[in-house]
Structure formats: C-alpha cells, structure tokens
Amino acid sequence: MKPLKIIFAGTPDFAAQHLQALLNSHHQVIAVYTQPDKPAGRGKKLQASPVKQLAEQYNIPVYQPKSLRKEEAQAQFAQLQADVMVVVAYGLILPKAVLEMPRLGCLNVHGSILPRWRGAAPIQRAIWAGDKQTGVTIMQMDEGLDTGDMLHKVYCDITAEETSASLYHKLATLAPPALIDVLDELESGKFIAEKQEDSKSNYAEKLSKEEAKLDWSLSAAQLERNIRAFNPAPVAFLTVPVNEAEERIKVYRAEVLPHQNSAAGTVLAFDKKGLRIATAEGVLNIQQLQPSGKKPMSVQDFLNGRADWFVLGQVLN
C-alpha cells in the first residue's frame, strides 16, 4: 500500500504518542502543526509542546500559527500538498477551507465512543457519569465540534478504581494502532463512514475548579466518581475552617459506605480508617488527602498534628 503524506496537528503528550506511531509506520509525516510555545514553570520560560519536541528530534518542519483562519497561514498549509491531515488534541479550530485542502480530508482521534461525549473532556466526564465503557473514535472531521462521520471505534472498560490518569494511559495505548489501521485502509474503503446520532450526544465540557469542590448535597457514589475523574487535575477538594481561615484540602482517594442519618456534610468520624462525611446519600470515607504545600498522604498521617482540624458533628460547606 502506498505511503500517505501526512500533516499532523496536536499538542500534548497524548498527541505525541500518536505522532510517534506515525513516525514508526511506513507513512510520511511531512509537517507538524502545534500550539505556540507557552510560558511554564517558575521562571515562566517559553516551553515547546511535547509534539513540537518530538517533531524536532526527527527534523520535521513545525508550524505554530495562532490561528488557521488567515489567508497567509492557509496558503502555507496548501503548499504542503498533504494526502491527509491527522488531528489529535490540537487545540485550534480548523476552518472549512483547511478541512477541505488535504486530498483525503482530515481525521481526528477522539477520546470517547462518539456520539456519547463530544467536547474537551470526554475521559473525565465518562468517569464522573459512571460510564462502564468508553474507548476512542477515529472520525472524518467536519466543521462541527466532534460531529464528523465515524470510521473506526475501539472499546475499553472503565474499572471501579479508574482515574482520569489511568484511563488516559489506556486510551493512549489503544488509539495509535487503530489510527494506523485506518490510514492503511483509507483509500481502500474498508472502513465505512457512519453518521452520528445527534440525539445521543452529550457535551463534555472542560472541568472547572468550581466543580472540583466536593458538594455534599450529591451522593457518596457521585462524589467518589468526582474524585477519580478530577485526578490528576484539577483535583477534587474540600474546605475546612482552621484558625479563622479556610484550609483547602485536596482529595485523591475515597470509598462509599452505607448511609447514616445525618445532615449532608456532617463529619461522622476521623481515624486511621479514614475521614467519614455524610452526603445526600451514603457516607464518603476519604482515605488519601493533600494539605496545602504537602504531598498526598493517608488520613492517619494527615491527622498527626492536624487532629484539631475536624470536629465530630461539624457540618462542612
């Protein structure tokens, strides 16, 4: 089969793993598009994206336009004369003119089984919603947000202990081989394009820091999923009044216990087994915490020197 000339567009590590798979294949990556370098770290030095760093190792031309809407950027893109563009977590909107330039269109790798979760945070929203299964969809891009025709789906289970970090790793392992399969057969017609059912779609909005605050009016099961969905970022948290200030404590692990008849947010117990807090339904037993400026730790370690932070019967906000 004839190698395809590919433009790759992506930014984070998840995208870099797909670029590596393309570089290991018989296809030819002729150019890479990625977000402009951004200030990072304490010194706020400009840092290249993982995709740019990888492309430079292979001496592949890198383009970093702030937008692809301008004529100059589009003319530059057209001159590359790619067979196909592959987009993985790029972060820029592609206008119709760009989508139509490659001979075989633009493919996108999306971290859910479409149309279930469209949008920026499908991995996190799937865990928070309690989905038992997810996967990746490789689709032909159109002007909509994750609305294009689907070419290939690969499924995986979401376990009861799954965090966004572990699921992200699973999908980053599953998706690149599936992408290569689609590219290998793109001209043969093996993968039949399937339309999405809009009525079955949900919008996976980016996680906000406001949502990360544990809301005791939800059930313990919902809060436990929240904790896993928000790990590794932005990390779920609770607040507790300490010396007339409000301490924010990050929460990394918890379990659901049967209900006790107490108001939501009531501190029921705290010992080496955990910090038990009443919710709208069931009890959340928090097992791993992180006070400000410290590393994540067990509740037993947390209570050493901080046992007075909680009072039995107090109701947390």
Swiss-Prot record:
For this chain, one GO molecular function annotation is: methionyl-tRNA formyltransferase activity
| A cellular component annotation (GO) from this entry | cytosol
What is the name attached to this protein's record?
Methionyl-tRNA formyltransferase
What is this enzyme's EC?
Answer: 2.1.2.9
Species per Swiss-Prot/TrEMBL record: Mannheimia succiniciproducens (strain KCTC 0769BP / MBEL55E)
Which keywords belong to this entry? Protein biosynthesis, Transferase
Spell out the CDD domains in the cross-references. FMT_core_Met-tRNA-FMT_N, Met_tRNA_FMT_C
Family listed: Belongs to the Fmt family.
Encoding gene per record: fmt
User: InterPro entries, from UniProt?
Assistant: Fmt (IPR005794), Formyl_trans_C (IPR005793), Formyl_trans_C_sf (IPR037022), Formyl_transf_N (IPR002376), Formyl_transf_N_sf (IPR036477), Formyl_transferase-like_C_sf (IPR011034), GART_AS (IPR001555), Met-tRNA-FMT_C (IPR044135)
Where along this sequence does the record place binding of (6S)-5,6,7,8-tetrahydrofolate?
S112, I113, L114, P115
Quote the Gene3D superfamilies the UniProt record gives.
Answer: Formyl transferase, C-terminal domain, Formyl transferase, N-terminal domain
Lineage runs: Bacteria, Pseudomonadati, Pseudomonadota, Gammaproteobacteria, Pasteurellales
Its job:
Attaches a formyl group to the free amino group of methionyl-tRNA(fMet). The formyl group appears to play a dual role in the initiator identity of N-formylmethionyl-tRNA by promoting its recognition by IF2 and preventing the misappropriation of this tRNA by the elongation apparatus.
Reaction catalyzed: L-methionyl-tRNA(fMet) + (6R)-10-formyltetrahydrofolate = N-formyl-L-methionyl-tRNA(fMet) + (6S)-5,6,7,8-tetrahydrofolate + H(+)
